[in-house]
Each structure stands twice: as structure tokens, then as C-alpha cells.
A protein has these predicted regions:
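Short acidic capping loops at alpha-helix termini that bridge into adjacent secondary structure
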Residues: 95-97, 162-163
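Short, hinge-like loop/turn segments at secondary-structure boundaries
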Residues: 89-91, 114-119, 185, 209-213
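S-adenosyl-L-methionine
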Residues: 1-96, 136-140, 218, 223-239
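Hydrophobic pocket-lining residues within nucleotide cofactor-binding pockets
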Residues: 93, 104-106, 170, 197
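Conserved Rossmann-like nucleotide-binding pocket used by diverse enzymes
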Residues: 50, 72, 100, 147, ...
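Conserved acidic-Pro-Pro-aromatic motif
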Residues: 45-46, 67-73, 80, 154-239
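Short N-terminal helix/helix-N-cap motif within the alpha/beta-hydrolase-1
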Residues: 58-61, 82, 109, 175-179
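Glycine-rich adenosyl-binding loop in Rossmann-like folds that engage adenosine-containing cofactors
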Residues: 10-38, 100-158
Length: 239
């Protein structure tokens, strides 16, 4: 079985690496988004971390192993979800990381997840719309049946505790995730969020205004050195 072990700061995590793409994701984890690693470094043991758009679980596992948080990961794409669970299994984290094969947006219900490419470790998929992170229509390589929930619904039905930290990386529907979390965003237990946004999209400008109005202080990170589009970058929001 192809695996590799990532070691940093006396922590080690075993990842399943069935493809060259996935091996590259693991190998570049600490250089692709250094601000994400730095942000995770602010977490405290026992806090609740919600990872929306977890992919194969790089940040879910790093936060859990390095900071001792309780993590809930959401990844609707079938191939990535399979690898995410294998990574949880390999690291004996079943009590610390729970993964759900769900999209998170502003609706609770069934729809399609439109895939940009049908390969594990890939991203730029879109739930309930075939528009990418640049708001451009694309022809899906595959449309997978999927189910969406909202952050408000998850917390209000006691599926998950109120999160202390949320990462949202969903390639274009970040605004929908925020709109489906309006009640939870007002809770003081929520300390911080990291959200991928596109400066060229009006809906993402709206997201920033909503968060400022709720009392979050926003810090912009530069685009990833690996990012194909330089208007896309992370913002970190702290109370």
C-alpha cells in the first residue's frame, strides 16, 4: 500500500498516497498554505475544529495530531472521502476525527456535486452548480449524487458541538456556507475562521462585509505559491 509519513515538530502523520498528485499534496503541505499551518498553531487542546472541504484530510489530521482538537470533517467527493477515512484509520484517530460525506452550503437537501475532474486529490468541484471558483461555467467530468447540510443545521440538531474554529475551502460557494451559518457565526464560542475567497467576485466581498459586521477582524494572506489564480487567497477571521 503506497503511504508516506509526514514528520514535523516531533509529530508524525501517515498518509495514503495512491497517486502522484496526492503525494505532491502531502509533500507541499507546509509550503502551499503556511498561513493555514500558522492559524492551526493558535488552536488549543480540546477545542472543536470544523473542516469544511477537507479533501484528503491534510489539515484535519495536522490540527488533531499537533494541537489535540476534536475535528469534524466534511468532504462530499467520493474518492477524496475514501482517502480521508483511510488516513483517519491509519493514524488511529477514529475518536478524534469524524468525517462525513456531505457538502456544506446554505441548503439542506439532495443535489449533484459537479466534478471538474474525476481523480482523487483534486478540487475545484461545485455543489448544486457547475460554476468554478471564478464563477465560470464548466462542463463536469462527472456529476455525483450528493447531500448538503448547513453549519446552523449541524449545530442546532446537535450533530456537532458549536465549533471554536472553522475552515471553509469549497472552491466557489464559500458565500453559501457563510449564509448557512449565520446563527453560529454570532456565538462567542466561535473564535476564528479561515476562508478561501476570490477578490474578483462580488459575493465574496459580501462575505467579508458580513464577517466584519459580526465583529470579526480580517487578515488577508497572500495567494498560495501554488495557486493558479492570484485573486484567490485565504482570509483569517478572528473575534
Amino acid at each position: 500500500t503506497p503511504t508516506c509519513t509526514l514528520e514535523k515538530n516531533n509529530f508524525s502523520i501517515k498518509f495514503y498516497t495512491p497517486t502522484v498528485n496526492i503525494k505532491a499534496l502531502v509533500d507541499t503541505m507546509f509550503v502551499a498554505e503556511p498561513e493555514t499551518i500558522e492559524w492551526i498553531g493558535e488552536f488549543e487542546k480540546g477545542e472543536i475544529f470544523l473542516d469544511v472541504g477537507a479533501n484528503i484530510g491534510l489539515y484535519s489530521l495536522w490540527a488533531t495530531v499537533s494541537k489535540g482538537v476534536r475535528c469534524f470533517s466534511f468532504e462530499p467527493e467520493s474518492l477524496n472521502f475514501s482517502i480521508l477515512n483511510r488516513n483517519i484509520f491509519y493514524n488511529n484517530l477514529v475518536d478524534k476525527v469524524t468525517a462525513y460525506p456531505l457538502a456544506v452550503s446554505d441548503q439542506v437537501g439532495f443535489d449533484f456535486l459537479h466534478l471538474s475532474v474525476f481523480e482523487s486529490g483534486e478540487s475545484c468541484h461545485s455543489f448544486a452548480s457547475n460554476k468554478n471558483f471564478a464563477d465560470q461555467e464548466f462542463v463536469p467530468a462527472f456529476s455525483q449524487g450528493s447531500f448538503s447540510t448547513t453549519i446552523d443545521h449541524l449545530v442546532e440538531t446537535s450533530m456537532i458541538p458549536t465549533p471554536n474554529h472553522i475552515k471553509i475551502d469549497v472552491d466557489g460557494i464559500e458565500n453559501k456556507v457563510i449564509n448557512g451559518a449565520r446563527k453560529i457565526l454570532e456565538r462567542p464560542e466561535l473564535k476564528s475562521m479561515l476562508i478561501e475567497i476570490n477578490d474578483d467576485l462580488p459575493c465574496d466581498s459580501e462575505v467579508k462585509e458580513i464577517l466584519k459586521d459580526l465583529g470579526f477582524i480580517l487578515t488577508s494572506a497572500p495567494p498560495s505559491v501554488l495557486a493558479p489564480v492570484k485573486s484567490v487567497h485565504n482570509i483569517i477571521c478572528r473575534r
